[in-house]
Amino acid sequence: MHRIAVLTEQETRGAQMEEQIARFCKERGRFPRIEPYRNQESFFCAVLTASFSHAVIALPGVAGLNAVEHLRALCPACRIIWCSDLDFSLHAFRLRVDYFLLEPVTEEVFRRGLLVWLEGRTSIAPCSFDSNNH
């Protein structure tokens, strides 16, 4: 059984991501254990006791980068979707992240990431950029 961690500081956003993951998996006859975390300390304590098969890291700025780097060091085989407000796509490539999403993340783009992640499909686009052309 898949063990999926969702690390985000925002409770509402975390709940939305957890719901999307559960719905996506249910449509495919999969029923993973989804575990929400609102801070890095509790997340990494959990990683040390039992590794995750998959993780969504949705933290702002350098906090997200640090979390992904630390997770990769502790759990090299973990499949990762990383959502960030800063363009860390080159770091995501270096850290072997399955799917990198640049904020704002739409439900459609997140589902695309889940396809790559849970069904082993290859990524069409390594990152998603918003339409504001920053």
Spans of features found by a protein language model:
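Conserved acidic carboxylate
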Residues: 8
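Two-component/phosphorelay signaling modules centered on CheY-like receiver
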Residues: 11-35
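Acidic, metal-coordinating helix/loop segments flanking the phosphotransfer/catalytic sites
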Residues: 36-53
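A short, hydrophobic beta-strand element within the central beta-sheet of small alpha/beta folds
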Residues: 56-57, 77-87
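Short amphipathic alpha-helix used as the core "switch/output" element in two-component signaling
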Residues: 63-77
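A Lys-centered signature of the CheY-like receiver
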Residues: 103
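CheY-like receiver
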Residues: 107, 111-134
